[in-house]
UniProtKB/Swiss-Prot annotation, chain A:
Protein name: Glycosylphosphatidylinositol anchor biosynthesis protein 11
Known function: Acts in the GPI biosynthetic pathway between GlcNAc-PI synthesis and GPI transfer to protein.
GO terms under cellular component: endoplasmic reticulum membrane
Positions of region (Disordered): 21-48
Sample GO molecular function, one term: mannose-ethanolamine phosphotransferase activity
Cellular localization per UniProt: Endoplasmic reticulum membrane
Family: Belongs to the PIGF family.
Pathway as given in its UniProt record: Glycolipid biosynthesis; glycosylphosphatidylinositol-anchor biosynthesis
Skewed-composition ranges (Low complexity): 32-48
Matching Pfam families: PIG-F
Transmembrane segments: 91-111, 145-165, 177-197, 215-235, 248-268
GO biological process, any: GPI anchor biosynthetic process
Taxonomic lineage of the native organism: Eukaryota, Fungi, Dikarya, Ascomycota, Pezizomycotina
Membrane topology: Multi-pass membrane protein
Amino acid sequence: MPLVDPVTMSSSAIVKGAVAQSTSTTKSTPGSQATESSTTTAGSSSSLATLRPVQIKQTPAAQTVRHALPAALTALYLLRFDALVTNPVPVMLNALPVVAAFQMTYALLCLPAAGEPASKSNRKPRPGEKKKGGDIGSSTIITALLASVLTSIVTPFLYFAMVLFGAPFLTHGSHTFLCAAHLALLTLFPLFYVHGVDSAAWAAVGGFRAPLDETFGGLVGGIVGAWLGAVPIPLDWDREWQRWPVTILCGAYGGYLLGRVLGGTLFWGKKF
Amino acid sequence: MSFRRNGNLSSTLLLIAANVLIPVAIVIFATGFFPYKPLLPGLAQYEPLDGYGEPPEAPFDKLVFMVVDALRSDFVYTTNSGFKFTQSLIRHGAAIPFTAHATSPTVTMPRLKAITTGSVPSFLDVVLNIDEGDESSSLASQDTWLAQMKAKDTGKLVMYGDDTWLKLFPGTFDRADGTTSFFVADFTEVDHNVTRNIPGELRNDDWNTMILHYLGLDHIGHKGGPRSPHMVPKQREMDGIVSQIYKAIETQDHLKSTLFVLCGDHGMNDAGNHGASSPGETSPALLFISPKLKGLQKNQDSPLPDAEDFQFYSTVEQSDLAPTLAALLGFPIPKNNLGVLIADFLSIWPKKADQAYLLHENARQIQTVISAASGTKTFDGALPAESCASPTSDYEQLACEWQGPSNNLMSARVGDDMDSQWALPVVTWLRKAQELMSGMASNYDMSRLILGQITALLAVIFSLSAAIKTVSPTRSLTPLLVISIAYSIMMFASSYVEEEQHFWYLATSTWFGYLTLRGFKRANTTFPAHLLLTAFPVLASLRLLRAWNQTGQKHAGTPDIVKLFIEPHPHFLWLLVGLTYFWTHRQLVYSFHGRIPVPINYPVMTGLVLAAFTFKAAFTLEDAPELVVEFVKSSLLDFTRGASLIARARAVFVGLGLVAMAAMGFILWEMRGAGGNRKRSRRKKGPAEAITTLQHLYTILALTQSRTANIPVFLIFNLLYWFLSSEIDAPDGTGLSTVELGISSLLLQYASFFAMGGSNAISSVDLSNAYNGVSNFNVVLVGILTYVGNWAGPVWWAFGTVVLLGEIWRRDQRQKRLGSGNNGKRGSDEKEEEAEAKQMLEGGQISPFKTYVAVTTLFTAFSVAAVMAACTILRTHLFVWTVFSPKYLYCVAWSLVQHLVINVGLSGLLFWLGSF
Ligand SMILES: [Zn+2]
Ligand SMILES: [Zn+2]
């Protein structure tokens, strides 16, 4: 069984930094983020055109935000947990803009916007040249806005997917929808920011063939976490937090943060 | 090559060993877990008690015993009850009310056993309750108060109502009219058949015992729950009968010493079902009624406000009825009784010596039971004081504690002056003995439990190594192992056992989500189109299945598709039902196409499907008339008016049998043709297609045995089946592998069981179709019909899997031929195909059927071992009789019937037939 399907391979697999592909095949580690390293291919299948793992920007601001935001999200979650249990809908609704701001900051400061940064650095691969820190140009902001629009478009579909996997359909509509919105904001927004609407990239993500990085790790973690969140619901402990959708949201946040941290460090560049 | 063959042989042997060990383990464990309780034989006689005179005179000589099935305590005692007359009797002291605690399993037969023998029936009585014709459940040879009343020879025994009594006491009743509860939609006729006998019998003076057992109230519960609009009118009807009998006792001279007992055999839960041990189910009402009882001056308040726990007045054990009746009617206490004489009645006997006699007789009888159980003669002489300082067993402890009560009885006998509470220590001691003897924990045979456990673990090891040897690459077993291990862990939590369906639903959706996503790799469509056209229909089908019937304990009775969309819209239901039958008809005709000429094929299949459809309509008209729409009634039923349900069902079964035989005939014919004459044309169908005929015939059987509201589920099954089939035919070798098909089949078998309303509770066993076409009880037939009625979905998937396995097998052969580049010559093609088939069967290559068996065996071994471990470790847990024992019985059904008989036996036969 071939690992990569001929169909996908031939048609549209994208290469971020296609120029560099032939020049460098050394495996990079997330620690050595010189300019070149962002152009190297990851993984052993360098002969195939594949998706590269996303590099976090090297600016001090990006590195700070990268570590500070997961902590801030965790703090926010723990702080609002009791309120979430008693009053899920308003709490989730109010938290949504805060989480959106967090994710927006994260994307703008840490992530390469769709297409642009990688190609920019590829066009002038001068060794030793430091990329200008935090150059949030108008185009990146537009990318971020587009990504948030895409995220909100995809939220109803995510809601629908949750219903298909067993979320209540006739009741708890706003609960499930807000939960889907949180999940989309956490896991899909960074991916939209990084990949845009690149169908080949999304095919790789959807087929679980993309290499692990903070964005894809976060997606996998968030989905697995939300999935595992359904496990404690049937228990007869009669706790308030067993109510829909507290455990799902809890699993989504926990899984997302874990997946993002692990995907960005330990498993960076690895594939399933 | 030879290594490969050896590996294949050894894995086959391991697989066989595992499948032999599974039933062995189940039997060994069951004999230790459900021990056979030794019963004292013979009828109790009055034996002289040391120092006492004659047995005290009994205040009553006749008994009217009225059972209202599922009469929960609050139905009689609370403000919104319909029992107004009975409540007035309570206020006047003519009725002494109790809440009688019924132990789990709260189903009729074990409850009647407890009521009549005074003992606690073993859990296996549940199985025998379903298997109603079993001889061993008969009480004809046991000591009961019925046998004692008969032995008194002061009158005849008569019985009107639930024929469970006739099955329990064959030959005991002189006059009887049994009613059956085939159709729970019957609220009135079933009770009218009892009531019409009462006036005549009240005039007769030739009986000393009259049993009445009303089923209507139970039926209303099953149909509409305790708050059904039919409930209070039914209670008023029952109250009217109480009034009728009470007034007869008051006025008629030959009835003046009649004791009238009104009780429920069990209660019901909020959904109107029973079987488990929720407070509602275990709290039936119990009343002793007679004008004579006014003398006790026990006037009590009535009605009472609602109580959450259903405990009203004082609570007694259901088994206490036996010794109390013995005292009140004057006969020896039945030998195996564990009940305690209800102390409220002691003051009927003015003399203390008489009261002491009754208590002492109760104690002595229970001591005999204890001695028999413990195998010692603990109560024969006085125990040495030193052994009482540190008793070695519960029995010894009990014997030591007997000293105090025994002294009290002694003083009461000789007429010493004593305070009014003198009897209390005796009753306390009796209760303690009752508790000890009713507790099951001491009865486990630990060595058998452990031996069964070890055998099951061996089966796990064997099946695991067989699977590793059979399946390549080994890592494709990972999902199966994850499912098996997660399931095993889950078995240790009672709530996960009760809510097992969630595990299968989530696992199935995830697995099929993975399969559909994976399918995108080779799809020629865009991602959204693939999602819309493949992933969405598959996952939506699973979501519909999940919501079809709400099952489990936690949310029992909450709305589901059946309650929200099917029951309120019968037209919609019949549209879907008609579509299901039409679809099956189409497939059946198609599978015979080319074998038999159209002028025969079409009418025969149409007749068969119409017979099945009209049977379903006629059955539903009896079972759930509110679901039958006018159109169905007028067009279909009038068309075949007059045919009885039994005749209709038999017509369907005979038709199915004949067509199945024809299909088998074609298979054998074509097998012979294939062996001798190689020149069968391409257009002619092979046995593989004949197997699909059997599959469609089974679909008709499954429809016949399923509840009407569940029939549309088979349309959903067909959609999922079509998806799996399309996955097999993937062009480039990325299609479904045998292991993946095995996992899909396993998941769908379990998910479909729960989707059709199954659960791990005894109360969810659906008996409504168990007697289709059966007039005289036949254990085998009723057993098969019950199994198909409850496992219709899982068996359907087993059939489907065999057909799909055949598709995989032919696909692999095709690919091998293409791979060897030998696809030029058409003539030798077929020869080779057959040669390869032979080779495959003889072990040159692993047959997909073997891989499938390896998959199901692995899971079955894991589940059996896990359920046994859970039952052993949690054997003293509160839930062992309500959650884990029923789970064990379900696990037995899954592994012995579904796995061994269906997935290995039947599927193996079909695969073998289809592989020629
Ligand atoms: Zn009953
Ligand atoms: Zn019932």
